[in-house]
Swiss-Prot record:
This is Exodeoxyribonuclease 7 large subunit. The keyword Nuclease applies. It comes from Staphylococcus haemolyticus (strain JCSC1435). One of its GO terms (molecular function) is exodeoxyribonuclease VII activity. Keywords: Cytoplasm, Exonuclease, Hydrolase, Nuclease. Disulfide bonds: none annotated. Belongs to the XseA family. InterPro entries: Exonuc_VII_L, Exonuc_VII_lsu_C, OB-fold_nuc-bd_dom. Bidirectionally degrades single-stranded DNA into large acid-insoluble oligonucleotides, which are then degraded further into small acid-soluble oligonucleotides.
Amino acid sequence: MSEYLSVTTLTKYIKYKFDQDPHLQSILLKGELSNFKKHSSGHLYFNVKDKDSVISAMMFKGNANQLTFEPKEGDEVLLEARVSVYERRGNYQIYVNKMELDGIGNLYQKLEQLKQKLKKEGFFNNEHKKPIPRFPKKIAILTASTGAAIRDIQSTINSRYPLAEKIQISTLVQGTQAKEDIIKNIKYADSLGVDTIIVGRGGGSIEDLWNFNEEDVVKAIFECQTPIISAVGHETDFTLSDFVADVRAATPTQAAVMATPDQYELMQQIKQYQFSLSRYIKQYLEKQYKQLDHLASYYKFKQPSLLYDQQIQRKDDLERQLTQLLLSKIENKKYQLKVLHQNFNVKTLNQTILQNKRQLVNVKNRLSNLTMKNIHNNKLEFKNKVELLNNLSPTNTMLRGYSIINKDDKVITSTQDLSKDDEITLAMKDGNVDAIVKKVRCEHE
């Protein structure tokens, strides 16, 4: 009798077969994400599909944390996974270990990451933007030597501002060698001393334009000292070169427009300036003519002598006043000199000298008498003080029979300072006597 298998047993057997097949344990798969969900646990659940089939898939939190982008519905992805069976539902599904964007999606991811990095470093800040010269003498054009871009730029410059010298620098704008060629030619153009540099090319896919998203190209544009207009692709195309350039043009033609003034507009401005200047000069001359006519009608201009008659008379008056003033000054000085001469004669001078001599002798005599009197008085005062000092001297006192008692080199002035058997010294006029106190008697005893 045949043995019937349970659903669980069959499911486990199928899972065992899947898990043991080496071809299913490490597969590379590409497809589109659908029904994408991120669980609160951090695990990812989604389907991978192409136009004909759908496979269930999941990615554990640990692997999901290693992703360099945020997966979303509709992303084209490349997966590294293993195939197994989810026993509870009996479905086979893939367990994804690695995931990355496929093709263009990966390029857009790299573009966004580099854009954010450069933005954070300040490469796109407005303070670094240089103004485009209004009237350029030389314009360097960096683009392919053939193609619509160079033709559009040259024809536009020729029609708008033929005075500008165009320096075409043939540059690779696509391919593996384009990046280095773009960088080299930007540095070369910067060294030429041109006024403006146009870097551009025609439109294309993101892969075609990718060289203008390279970090080294962006830095070369940023470091360039000459103003740069970026004209890469069509109006809807954007590259990192557009963000870092001083000005972004939607097309190569627009770049040429931004780099040059319009000669016809300039001619109109010049004509307007000529008209305004002519009108101003005409109005100014009319005003001056009117003023001249008004002055010419003034009565003094009809009789020119009236302009200077009064001035001549005024000059004569000033001359007379000046002459009178000088004569008056001279007479005054003569008078002062005469007075001085009268006051200053020999006789008067001799009398003055003689009188001063007499006064000097009198002062000298008075001073001498006063000095002698002061000396005499001082001598008497000194003598009296010396006599007084001698009378008060201890030596004179001892000459009269008195003595001075010393104890321990101190003068004794009272019996209260002595005791029996004290050793004392008696100072007399002709020497000292050492003695011992036998008895002390006070006056009140």
